[in-house]
Swiss-Prot record:
Part of the RNA polymerase complex. GO terms for molecular function: DNA binding; DNA-directed RNA polymerase activity; protein dimerization activity. Keywords: Cytoplasm, DNA-directed RNA polymerase, Nucleotidyltransferase, Transcription, Transferase. The gene is rpo11. It is an enzyme of class 2 (transferase). It holds the Pfam family RNA_pol_L_2. This is DNA-directed RNA polymerase subunit Rpo11. The lineage of its organism: Archaea, Methanobacteriati, Methanobacteriota, Stenosarchaea group, Halobacteria.
């Protein structure tokens, strides 16, 4: 997975996440929206300016109480924690 910063402002971050699809992006978006200070989290895999399919671009907006890059890090940690919890529950049920 490669990341490329598109825009990095005080309360907004847009970053391209190469090689991912709707499955991962929806989970990441959901984890971001659970964070205090995140006012919006969206992603787009077909921006109008691209003229066609692109790698997904996630956009994070905050209220200023959290840096958008820190929010991305915390959101990714939440995804990892949820994945680990699911794996443990699955193994316990098997």
């Amino acid at each position: 997975m490669d990341l490329r910063v598109i825009e990095n402002l005080e309360t907004e971050l847009a970053i391209e996440i190469e090689g991912e699809d709707h499955t991962f992006m929806n989970v990441l978006k959901g984890a971001l929206l659970e964070l205090d200070g995140v006012t919006a989290a969206t992603y787009d895999v077909n921006p109008e300016q691209s003229g066609g399919q692109t790698e997904p671009i996630v956009t994070i907006k905050t209220d200023g109480s959290i840096d958008p890059l820190d929010a991305l890090e915390q959101g990714a940690s939440r995804v990892r924690d949820k994945t680990d919890a699911f794996e443990e529950a699955f193994e316990a049920a098997a």
